[in-house]
């Protein structure tokens, strides 16, 4: 059985949001990100590990947020070290509106909160969710930048999957702000 977070991470081929401002960049190396739903959710805290560098961090930073594949719109606003990110993405033709808030030093630790709304009901919607990241040091042997290790020990090569997706005919990374977007 696939856990809700694992399912969300499996479908996540997150694109760095386009916009006037950029996502914060975390210190390169190994990050542990603890994710836990707010309230009375049945989803317990889960932890993933991410190996980052400057070229993969924007993808991995948003990788804990469900439904960030095939994004058509995004906005990033930064104010006094706090980031407010909004995306409109599609998963199997189901519109996903995400709101993400981030804050922290991004060199040793950060925290955030996300909430996603689906146009059509889905089986596992975690509801409002908090996450905290902390830098652990250098990536472990065998890990490459862009790798994410799930709670069950499975390693996803997020950056590699993104590259494969970009290589497909007709794919646009939406750097045009979604001007050529369509469901």
PLM region spans:
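Short, solvent-exposed loop/hinge segments that bridge or flank secondary-structure elements
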Residues: 34-70, 153-156, 160
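Short, cysteine-centered beta-strand-loop-beta hairpins and adjacent loop/turn segments enriched
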Residues: 38-42, 91-96, 118-125, 139
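Hydrophobic/aromatic beta-strand elements that line small-molecule binding cavities or substrate pockets
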Residues: 48-50, 72-75, 97-104, 114-118, ...
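Mid-chain, structured segments of secreted extracytoplasmic proteins
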Residues: 61-105
């Amino acid at each position: 059985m696939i856990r809700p977070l694992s399912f969300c991470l499996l479908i996540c081929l997150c694109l760095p949001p386009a916009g006037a401002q950029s996502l914060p960049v975390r210190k390169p190396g190994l990050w542990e990100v603890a994710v836990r739903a707010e309230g009375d959710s049945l989803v317990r805290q889960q932890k993933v590990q991410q190996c980052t560098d400057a070229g993969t961090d924007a993808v991995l930073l948003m990788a804990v947020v469900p439904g960030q594949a095939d994004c058509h719109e995004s906005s990033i606003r930064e104010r006094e070290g706090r980031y407010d990110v909004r995306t409109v993405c599609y998963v199997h033709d189901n519109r996903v509106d995400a709101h993400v808030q981030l804050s922290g030093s991004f060199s040793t630790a950060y925290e955030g909160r996300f909430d996603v709304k689906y146009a059509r009901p889905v089986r596992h919607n975690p509801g409002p969710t908090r996450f905290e990241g902390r830098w652990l040091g250098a990536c472990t042997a065998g890990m490459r930048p862009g790798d994410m290790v799930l709670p069950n020990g499975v390693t996803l090569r997020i950056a590699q999957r993104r590259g494969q997706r970009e290589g497909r005919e007709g794919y646009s990374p939406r750097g045009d702000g979604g001007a050529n977007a369509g469901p």
